[in-house]
């Protein structure tokens, strides 16, 4: 099949790589324009562009898709069979979606219609979902509303964070794309509609995965410990608090149950403080912080100006005292 690939972040690279190594032909790659991503205002190409250029694939980075007749004419000249779209970063207008002979197809990182939208991986962890997955859908004008051709679910492990789950779903996307394209190719002279499942028939509750904003990255210690744990994993490694007026990124924590506190003879004073306070200091083990429910043990964090540090080193860097407050 003759394919034009649309994608931007690292998540998309695995699928492009797999397609490049397959029997299918990648005619061109469409990705977001280079952006200033580091100090010195240096322009950095997207991960997809970097891979495509390394492989000698034609790359296009349109600033806009609306009222861009020249670019639309260019797409039509390729006479491609499919558009494959994975985390491109912009909504494709219908007049672009309808260009390929066998339409445009998207790999979406959720079990649709649950978590339509921009941040499905983050929200599946934030909400404590037991399972997630990938669906390959035929694209239409609506936001992730298309009919599903193939899908597969995987379990979200308790220790999964944004990095680990993104890797699993990126790999799964590449696997399912090949299956989906094979089905499309096998039925290219037939009506494929009988192979598609409408999202309303998938018996899942519709939920939207809104974009993550700056305030989402701040820990509210008045939340319960489970919600704090999920936030740290879902938005890894960018969740933060403050301590002694310095920014502290929380990388990893452990929820301490009552039994564990008693069995390990941890001495804490949780009954004296509201959420967000240092309520225990364990030699060589770290800092215990109060929440709305169970206390948490700080395992890994990054103090501004420092590298990621573990428990003993954090004790030295922060020099905390019982009763000192986080997010001061």
UniProtKB/Swiss-Prot annotation:
(6S)-5,6,7,8-tetrahydrofolate binds at residues 110-113. It holds the Pfam family Formyl_trans_C. One of its GO terms (molecular function) is methionyl-tRNA formyltransferase activity. GO terms for cellular component: cytosol. It comes from Prochlorococcus marinus (strain MIT 9515). The lineage of its organism: Bacteria, Bacillati, Cyanobacteriota, Cyanophyceae, Synechococcales. InterPro entries: Fmt, Formyl_trans_C, Formyl_transf_N, Formyl_transf_N_sf, Formyl_transferase-like_C_sf, Met-tRNA-FMT_N. Its EC number is 2.1.2.9. Attaches a formyl group to the free amino group of methionyl-tRNA(fMet). The formyl group appears to play a dual role in the initiator identity of N-formylmethionyl-tRNA by promoting its recognition by IF2 and preventing the misappropriation of this tRNA by the elongation apparatus. This is Methionyl-tRNA formyltransferase.
